Amino acid sequence: ASGQLHRPQPQEHTSTSAAAGTWRHTQASESRHRLPHCSAAPSHQDHSAMGFGPELWCPKGHSELLRLQDSELRLLELMKKWMSERAKSDREYAGMLHHMFSQLGSEEPPPALPLQEDRQSVCSTDQERSGVTALETIKNHISGIFSPRFSLPPPVPLIPEVQKPLCQQAWYHGAIPRSEVQELLKCSGDFLVRESQGKQEYVLSVLWDGQPRHFIIQAADNLYRLEGDGFPTIPLLIDHLLQSQQPITRKSGIVLTRAVLKDKWVLNHEDVLLGERIGRGNFGEVFSGRLRADNTPVAVKSCRETLPPELKAKFLQEARILKQYNHPNIVRLIGVCTQKQPIYIVMELVQGGDFLSFLRSKGPHLKMKELIKMMENAAAGMEYLESKHCIHRDLAARNCLVTEKNTLKISDFGMSRQEEDGVYASTGGMKQIPVKWTAPEALNYGRYSSESDVWSFGILLWEAFSLGAVPYANLSNQQTREAIEQGVRLEPPEQCPEDVYRLMQRCWEYDPRRRPSFGAVHQDLIAIRKRHR
C-alpha cells in the first residue's frame, strides 16, 4: 500500500510570550495527569528511545495508537485478498470499496502515523504536520492498489493522412481484379485506386452514371497527374480532386465523392514472413509463414504473376467466400495481400496436414470411434456451409485438413460458390471437375447444390474408412460415369461398420431429393459414434 500520511500538528496560538509557553506546558502536564490509568513519564532516555518527547508520553495512548495501526494493516491485507479474489470489473471493484468504507462508520478515529514513519520521532515541532484521519489513511494506502498497470511511451507526432504513402491509404486496394472493382463501387462518385494487373500502372476507378470508369494515373518527371497540374504523390493528387471537386477530366465531368475503403482482411505483404514451401496449388505455391505482429503461424497461398486476370480473380474467390465464415470445422481466413504482386491468401496453418496423407500414414493406428469423430467434424462443417447456401463443389479427403488434436477442418474453397437459392449452374466444361467425387446431375447438367455436396461427402466417407484408397481405382473417369448411370456404387471398405456404409448409400441416391441433408448426416454420425463405444 502507498500514499503519504502526515504527522499530527499541535494547534498554534498567537501568543509567543514565555508565560503563554509556561501555560501550555502546565496545561499539557495537568492534562497528562488527568488521563486515567496513566503513569508518570519515564526517564528522558526511555521515552526518547520510544520515539516520543516527554510532553506526549502516555502508555495507554501509545498502545491504542499501535492497536489502531495494526487494525488498519489487517484491514488492508484483508481487503487486498478479498478484492483480488472477488473483483471482476472496475464497477464491482468500486462497489466493494464503497461497501468496506461504509462499514468503517461515520465516526472518525484518532490520528494515525504514516506506516513508513512508525519509528520516527514526532516531537520535532519544525517537522510537525497536520494530521489525517484513519479513514483518509486507509484511502491513501489503498491508492497503491490502483496504481497504473502499464506505463505508456510518450505520444508520437501524428502524420496527416494525405502525407502517408500510397500503400497506407485506406482507398488503395492494390492489385485487385477489375471484376471485383465493379462489386465495390455502389454509388455515383464512389472511387478507389488500384494497381493494373500485369501493367504496373495505377488506375483510378470511379462509378459514374451507373458504369465503372477507369483512368490511368500518368507518371512523368516525378509527378502524378490525370489532367492538369501534377503532384509529387498520388495521395496529394486524390486529396486535391476531393477537396476542390474539380472534374477528373473536362471531357468526362466526373467528380470524386466518396472513397471506398479496403476491408479489414487486407494485409500488407510486409505483414507476413514467408517460410518454407509446403505445397502447390492450381494457382501457385503454398508456404508456411508467420504474421510479424504476433508471430501467428499461417499458411500463405500465392498466385503466379503470369496468370491472366480472369484466373487471378478465381484465385481470390476463395478469400471472398471464407471471409464470411467462422466455424471450428472450417479453415479460417486471416487476410489477403493484394497491395502488389504476387497476390497472397493468408490462412490459419493447420499443422496436421491434409486428411488424405493423414489417412494413409496414421489411419491404421486410429480407433474406429476416432475415425467416426473426424467424419462428424466434417459433417458439422458442411452443415454450417449448407446453412450459408455455400456449395463447396470439391469435397474430398485431399481438401480437408487435420489439426494436431485430430480435429478435421474443411478447406480449399477455390471451386466454391455461394448462391441465394443454393444451386449453381456451371458452364465451364469438364476440365477441372473431379469426376469420381462429383454427383451425376453436376456431371450431366452442371447443376451444383448442397445435395451434390452430399454425394461427394459419401465418397469422402468411403475414403476415410478405406484409409485413403482411390475410389473407382480400376476405372477411368468416363467408365466411372457410365457405371454410376447403370447403378454401380462403391463396395464397402474392409472393416467399415454397416451403419456407416448404409449412410454412404443414402448419400449416393441418384435422385438428389432423396439424399439426406448435412444436418441429418451430422446427427446420424453422432448416433453411430455413440453406438461404437
UniProtKB/Swiss-Prot annotation:
<dbReference type="InterPro" id="IPR020635">
    <property type="entry name" value="Tyr_kinase_cat_dom"/>
</dbReference>
<dbReference type="InterPro" id="IPR000980">
    <property type="entry name" value="SH2"/>
</dbReference>
<feature type="region of interest" description="Disordered">
    <location>
        <begin position="1"/>
        <end position="46"/>
    </location>
</feature>
<keyword id="KW-0727">SH2 domain</keyword>
<dbReference type="GO" id="GO:0005524">
    <property type="term" value="F:ATP binding"/>
</dbReference>
<keyword id="KW-0808">Transferase</keyword>
<dbReference type="InterPro" id="IPR017441">
    <property type="entry name" value="Protein_kinase_ATP_BS"/>
</dbReference>
<feature type="domain" description="F-BAR; degenerate">
    <location>
        <begin position="50"/>
        <end position="124"/>
    </location>
</feature>
<keyword id="KW-0418">Kinase</keyword>
<dbReference type="InterPro" id="IPR027267">
    <property type="entry name" value="AH/BAR_dom_sf"/>
</dbReference>
<feature type="compositionally biased region" description="Polar residues">
    <location>
        <begin position="11"/>
        <end position="29"/>
    </location>
</feature>
<keyword id="KW-0597">Phosphoprotein</keyword>
<feature type="binding site">
    <location>
        <begin position="278"/>
        <end position="286"/>
    </location>
    <ligand>
        <name>ATP</name>
    </ligand>
</feature>
<dbReference type="InterPro" id="IPR008266">
    <property type="entry name" value="Tyr_kinase_AS"/>
</dbReference>
<dbReference type="Pfam" id="PF07714">
    <property type="entry name" value="PK_Tyr_Ser-Thr"/>
</dbReference>
<feature type="domain" description="SH2">
    <location>
        <begin position="171"/>
        <end position="260"/>
    </location>
</feature>
<dbReference type="GO" id="GO:0004715">
    <property type="term" value="F:non-membrane spanning protein tyrosine kinase activity"/>
</dbReference>
<feature type="modified residue" description="Phosphotyrosine; by autocatalysis">
    <location>
        <position position="424"/>
    </location>
</feature>
<keyword id="KW-0067">ATP-binding</keyword>
<dbReference type="InterPro" id="IPR035849">
    <property type="entry name" value="Fes/Fps/Fer_SH2"/>
</dbReference>
<dbReference type="InterPro" id="IPR031160">
    <property type="entry name" value="F_BAR"/>
</dbReference>
<comment type="similarity">
    <text>Belongs to the protein kinase superfamily. Tyr protein kinase family. Fes/fps subfamily.</text>
</comment>
<dbReference type="Pfam" id="PF00017">
    <property type="entry name" value="SH2"/>
</dbReference>
<feature type="domain" description="Protein kinase">
    <location>
        <begin position="272"/>
        <end position="525"/>
    </location>
</feature>
<feature type="binding site">
    <location>
        <position position="301"/>
    </location>
    <ligand>
        <name>ATP</name>
    </ligand>
</feature>
<dbReference type="InterPro" id="IPR011009">
    <property type="entry name" value="Kinase-like_dom_sf"/>
</dbReference>
<keyword id="KW-0829">Tyrosine-protein kinase</keyword>
<dbReference type="InterPro" id="IPR000719">
    <property type="entry name" value="Prot_kinase_dom"/>
</dbReference>
<keyword id="KW-0553">Oncogene</keyword>
<feature type="active site" description="Proton acceptor">
    <location>
        <position position="394"/>
    </location>
</feature>
<dbReference type="InterPro" id="IPR036860">
    <property type="entry name" value="SH2_dom_sf"/>
</dbReference>
<dbReference type="InterPro" id="IPR001245">
    <property type="entry name" value="Ser-Thr/Tyr_kinase_cat_dom"/>
</dbReference>
<protein>
    <recommendedName>
        <fullName>Tyrosine-protein kinase transforming protein Fps</fullName>
        <ecNumber>2.7.10.2</ecNumber>
    </recommendedName>
</protein>
<keyword id="KW-0547">Nucleotide-binding</keyword>
<dbReference type="InterPro" id="IPR001060">
    <property type="entry name" value="FCH_dom"/>
</dbReference>
<dbReference type="InterPro" id="IPR050198">
    <property type="entry name" value="Non-receptor_tyrosine_kinases"/>
</dbReference>
